Amino acid sequence: MLALLRPYLSTRVLCVLVVCFSALMLVAFIPTLFRNDTALQIRASRQGTTLPDGFYVYQRLNAEGIRIKSITPDNDSLVIRFDTEEQSMAAEKVLHQLLPYGFDIGQMDPSGSSQLMNRLSLRKQSVG
């Protein structure tokens, strides 16, 4: 009798494993897909002006109690990501006071492809 049930059990076990794996993947990717982070972009508005050091910006914003998700250079700008819109707005206000004239600081609208890649990224983002 066990010989008769063996093919049925293996197919059933396989189906259960596929369903469990699918459920696990769904649970893993749902938070990543619906993550809503905001970003600021700092650009030099004049030729010859160098961007501020990312670590300096991190230290100053951290001293103000603003939590930063990541700071990365992007072409000729510095992109700072935050978990919430409130953190981003507070950081923009602090950066306007902190950085001298000659820098454009503003909210960054993520493009469709980079936003999708950001949402699909499973790597933990870090500062630095």
Curated annotation (Swiss-Prot):
Pfam families: SecD-TM1 (PF13721). Keywords: Cell inner membrane, Cell membrane, Membrane, Transmembrane, Transmembrane helix. The chain crosses the membrane at residues 14-34. Residues 35-128 are periplasmic. It is found in: Cell inner membrane. One of its GO terms (cellular component) is plasma membrane. The keyword Thylakoid does not apply. Residues 1-13 are cytoplasmic. It comes from the Bacteria. One of its GO terms (molecular function) is protein kinase binding. The keyword DNA damage does not apply. Its main location: membrane. It is a single-pass membrane protein. Interacts with EnvZ. Belongs to the MzrA family. Modulates the activity of the EnvZ/OmpR two-component regulatory system, probably by directly modulating EnvZ enzymatic activity and increasing stability of phosphorylated OmpR. NCBIfam families: PRK10629.1 (NF007915). This is Modulator protein MzrA.
